[in-house]
Design a protein with these regions (language model features):
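Acidic two-metal-ion nuclease catalytic site recognized across multiple nuclease folds
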Residues: 106-181
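Metal-dependent phosphoesterase core characteristic of DEDDh/y 3'-5' exonuclease domains
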Residues: 6-114, 119-122
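Short, small-residue-biased leader/transition segments that mark boundaries at the very start
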Residues: 2-4
């Protein structure tokens, strides 16, 4: 059994695809349920990287956004902290990254409170699936999309995924008729 308090929200920067995998493995190696820590007792996870992507794409006002030399947007924590003068002593140092993540969350919340609160309200998978299953197009941010659109696009659900909990979506920026014959 997990001794963490109920209603805990685990917030990180690129944590869903990186840190959480280490935590799961740590639990597994020590004979604990590798998933219980983030769902039991109304616990949840929230990845600020996707919040940053969505904010940059939809509501960038009030936040300085770093750009690489080639003109492409950069959402690295250390660059966001530097350009916005947030505390971040040493990139990839655990405590420093935590402090920068907290400061960045505070900045997004201060500059774009409605978007911040909305994204926080849909942090759980069941809330996201309500949007996905609504039958309406929705805005989606993912590292799998191009930088040209700040890794954000409008998609529509095509079908439930056959093997996983989730859905297969179609990027509505592309011609649907031409792709139907593929």
């Amino acid at each position: 059994t997990c001794a963490l308090p109920i209603y805990t929200v685990f917030v990180g920067f690129n944590s869903l695809r990186f840190d959480d995998e280490f935590l799961r493995y740590l639990h597994y190696r020590n004979f604990y349920d590798p998933y219980e820590w983030h769902w039991r007792g109304e616990r949840s996870r929230w990845d600020l990287l996707d919040v940053v992507r969505m904010t940059r794409a939809l509501r960038p006002e009030g936040i300085a956004w770093p750009v690489r030399e080639d003109g492409v947007g950069n959402n690295r924590l250390e660059e966001l902290a530097k350009i916005n003068q947030l505390p971040h002593e040493s990139a990839h140092n655990a405590l420093s990254d935590v402090q920068a993540t907290i400061a960045l969350a505070g900045l997004v919340r201060a500059k774009q409170p409605k978007l911040f609160d909305y994204l926080f309200s849909i942090r759980k998978k069941n809330e996201v699936m309500k949007i996905v299953d609504s039958g309406r197009p929705f805005v989606y941010s993912s590292g799998k999309y191009e930088n040209e659109f700040e890794k954000t696009t409008v998609v529509a659900k095509v079908v439930n995924h056959p093997d996983k909990q989730g859905a297969i979506v179609f990027d509505l920026r592309y011609d649907q008729i031409g792709r139907a014959h593929v």
